[in-house]
Amino acid sequence: VNGGYWFEAPEWKKHFLREVEVIRGRFDDYSNLPLDVNGDGWTDIVSVNYRSKSLFWVEHPGEAIKANPDTPWQKRLIDTPGPMETGRLADLDGDGDPDIIPNGVGFACWYEFDKGKFIKHELPQELSGHGIGVGDVNGDRRLDLVGPTGWLEAPADPKKGRWLWHAEFELSRDASVPILV
């Protein structure tokens, strides 16, 4: 998937997926995350966007795609939390389903994915900014979140517990990489 198209292997034939808005001279398509949102066995796409400030998913047309590979996918809004540069899928709550972690500019949150629903959980705002990573930073077997100036330590229950901010570093123009996850 790239923008408004999907590419069929093995020849990588281009097919229409959806219209992508152009907002203030830029395509509003910052991150496409593969996820079967509605549980029908087909891979849908979750889209994280900067200019429209929207988080939405586009529903795979299912069997209809076999007859017409250019069948448009249906857009379904999840939320409009604010501008997002990218997003990550990771199982933050350990329930076996990937959750959505948007890279918010001016806000920080994650969306618990539960049986086709998305439940928003706020995070400490220090995480917001340019860049996000997910991994076990401190070796406690929980997925922590890394931001541009530090990292958030995941609590035992990421849905209800307090995420602890660690202001560990400051990224500068020298491209230093203080934490790898």
What are these regions (language model features)?
Residues V1-V181:
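Beta-propeller-forming repeat regions
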